[in-house]
Amino acid sequence: MNRFTRYDVTPEAIFNQRRQIIKAMGLGAAALSLPNIGFAAEKSDQLKALNFKDAPKGDFLLTPENKVTGYNNFYEFGVDKASPAKFAKDFKTDPWSLEIAGEVENPFVLNHAQLFNTFPLEERIYRFRCVEAWSMVIPWVGFELARLVEMAKPTSKAKFVIFHTLHDPEQMPGQKNKFFGGGIDYPYVEALTIEEAMNPLTLLSVGLYGKMLPPQNGAPIRLVVPWKYGFKSIKSIVKITFSETRPRTTWEKLAPHEYGFYANVNPNVDHPRWSQASERVIGSGGLLAVKRQDTLMFNGYEKEVAHLYKGLDLKVNF
């Protein structure tokens, strides 16, 4: 797992201090929601604390939680970065069902509770790189997608894993009004190759910062693929289908010359309208505290994933 060196003290440094205090007191993970040792109490039941295995100890640069939950792309709730937090606050995620179907021997459905207790949860601290050339570092909570794939027992025909976001225009104003939702033909669809899905880095996340995902971050369950641009990490998933054929994904349909199927982070392949060689780091400061850094190949996960693309021309297959 990649490590991060803190170049500055951010508010989220309190997060690690807090965890050590909790453990020293002999309290469980539920204590992470307590308001008296560094964080304000959450009012929403959706944001209750989770039980999970901590990430390995380290000195990480974490993006402030308020930036992670307040600066989002989730066009189902509007195209402005602040719109998801504003318009998703009453989004209902329970009851919920996640259907597993297609080329599998064992199709099944998980309900809301089963999303959190079917597989052991663990924390993964990952870089997150948006195709818009900004980045964060986020402590996700979830489980390896490979665990779900193994439970489904894909057949030999299963070459791709397709993900579908909820389609509910009554709850998602961007689906009701195409202008408000960025002109997308909903529901949102993404996909991985079966090999990408089985990579140990690929995560199905149900939380961040020790709590359930907020609605604007893709509650109750979303994909996290840290070596790909953020639009591949589909949110609020209701169906996962195993297929023999590669689908055309949402952004691939909308603008195929700008957004390819693979969407691997690559500083050597620019977006048609901007460079991908560097990125703006979302930190604790405001607009005047902008920090840029060089973008790493595969977002810094080259050692773990480069073998998946051996022999593939990444400038053509972007």
Curated annotation (Swiss-Prot):
It catalyses: L-methionyl-[protein] + a quinone + H2O = L-methionyl-(S)-S-oxide-[protein] + a quinol; L-methionyl-[protein] + a quinone + H2O = L-methionyl-(R)-S-oxide-[protein] + a quinol. Its cofactor is Mo-molybdopterin. Belongs to the MsrP family. InterPro entries: MsrP, OxRdtase_Mopterin-bd_dom, OxRdtase_Mopterin-bd_sf. The gene is msrP. Predicted to be exported by the Tat system. The position of the signal peptide cleavage has not been experimentally proven. It is found in: Periplasm. The keyword Metal-binding applies. This is Protein-methionine-sulfoxide reductase catalytic subunit MsrP. PANTHER family: PROTEIN-METHIONINE-SULFOXIDE REDUCTASE, PROTEIN-METHIONINE-SULFOXIDE REDUCTASE CATALYTIC SUBUNIT MSRP. GO terms for cellular component: periplasmic space. It is an enzyme of class 1 (oxidoreductase). GO terms for molecular function: metal ion binding; molybdopterin cofactor binding; oxidoreductase activity, acting on a sulfur group of donors, quinone or similar compound as acceptor. It holds the Pfam family Oxidored_molyb. Part of the MsrPQ system that repairs oxidized periplasmic proteins containing methionine sulfoxide residues (Met-O), using respiratory chain electrons. Thus protects these proteins from oxidative-stress damage caused by reactive species of oxygen and chlorine generated by the host defense mechanisms. MsrPQ is essential for the maintenance of envelope integrity under bleach stress, rescuing a wide series of structurally unrelated periplasmic proteins from methionine oxidation. Its EC number is 1.8.5.-. Binds 1 Mo-molybdopterin (Mo-MPT) cofactor per subunit. One of its GO terms (biological process) is protein repair. Mo-molybdopterin binds at residues 72, 75-76, 130, 165, 217, 222, 233-235. Residues 1-40 form the signal peptide. The keyword Cell inner membrane does not apply. Heterodimer of a catalytic subunit (MsrP) and a heme-binding subunit (MsrQ). Keywords: Metal-binding, Molybdenum, Oxidoreductase, Periplasm, Signal. NCBIfam families: PRK05363.1. Transmembrane segments: none annotated.
